[in-house]
Amino acid sequence: MACRTLPSRRQEEETTKDLALKLPPGKPGGHLPSIDETRPIGPGPASRRGSLPGLHPSFSRRNSLAGPLVGPGGRRPSLGPVPPLGSRVSFSGLPLMLPRRMAPSYRLEPAPGEHWEAAGAQRALEAALTTQLNGVCYCGSEAGKLVQALCEQIHTRVRELNLPRYKLVCNVVLGPREGQGVHVVSRALWDAVHDGLASATFTNPSLFAVATVHAVYWE
């Protein structure tokens, strides 16, 4: 039968004293050391959340731009000039007209006296074409500006017919008179009861013009 020698009281006291020396001072014997307490003091390997070695102290994740690319206050510079708030710019760089804003009327049809009249609109088209094109000779380089002026003049004259809740779409076909034949055709998806169109033509020895206005009721 094997026998085991029991440690003496003096050996037990020395063992307990050695364990107490290994624990940090001021902590009870049953306290486990935290991660901060066991971390070695002094420079060591960088942690996972720390910065990468070799980077400048001013470098951070939220401020990746450095040098002259950073504006005042650490803001990132924009890619280009920002247009004023509320303005619209086309792809060609020219400003666009702002859309008309009207309060809802909660009506499904025009009010009395505000219905579309094709006869009155046609007279307005004929007057605009005669005023703008009388005595004008066709010039290919100036045709675009002339058509734009015609559309603006037609839009202004038709608006004078008391049509507050109609959207107007103006189209003008302009070309030289060289003995050719031209057919201008238009198709639209609309309400046949309240919407409508008007068309007028103009010719002189140098040019011809066909103007069309589509009027769509805006509920």
From Swiss-Prot:
Biased composition (Basic and acidic residues): 9-20
Keyword check for Nucleus: yes
Region feature (Disordered): 1-84
Keywords: Cell projection, Cilium, Cytoplasm, Cytoplasmic vesicle, Cytoskeleton, Flagellum, Nucleus, Phosphoprotein
Any one GO CC term of the record: nucleus
Binding partners and assembly: Interacts with ENG/endoglin, TGFBR2 and TGFBR3. Interacts with PPP1CC.
Protein name: Dynein light chain Tctex-type 4
Species the sequence originates in: Mus musculus
